[in-house]
Amino acid sequence: KFGFASYSCSSDVDLALEVALKGENGVAVIMGTGLVAFARSGETLHRTGGRGYMIDKGGSGFHFGSDAFNCAFEFIEGRGGSETILKLVEKRFGKSLESSVAEIYDGGASFVASFASVVFEAFMLGDSSACEIIDRNAYEAAKIINGARKSLGNNENRIVICGGLCKQKEILYPFLEKYIDGDFLLEFLDEPIVNGAISLAGRINKC
């Protein structure tokens, strides 16, 4: 149907690199539930980040969602926070946040990450706490991107971001832009990572 032979891919990393870079050099950044960057120059590949939510500090969907919960509880407890974020979180749950704690822990990292969108929705409503959350996470994401580029001597200017947070590219771009070092070309890719398998098979079939 696709006009090429079958191909067995070794890992999701191969697919992400292919769909982001299409066999070219650069930095591929996966911003989904977690966050990891891969810098490639020829046959050299360097990984930065992606150590999991118990180690990494921010920039992932999990951290955006976790920050939303924390911000909401801060408001409940009179420690600052955001009433807007609290209302959006409770709207998603359909009940009070205080009665939803067990559900949060039962849901795990991917469930927490699903609340990342709340932060961006609050930002669009002009919420200052949401702006702070985005800025802080963009800073952490940029540190990982900068580390990946440094591993290759900052010789690769192309940075391609893929994953679920690409849906927020219009908001994320200016926040990331101010923290990424040097000259760069930043792209957000909406294409599903699984398409990397099709692209890889097509290129290999031409060899």
What is each PLM-predicted segment?
Residues K1-E83:
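Phosphate-binding/catalytic loop of phosphoryl-transfer enzymes
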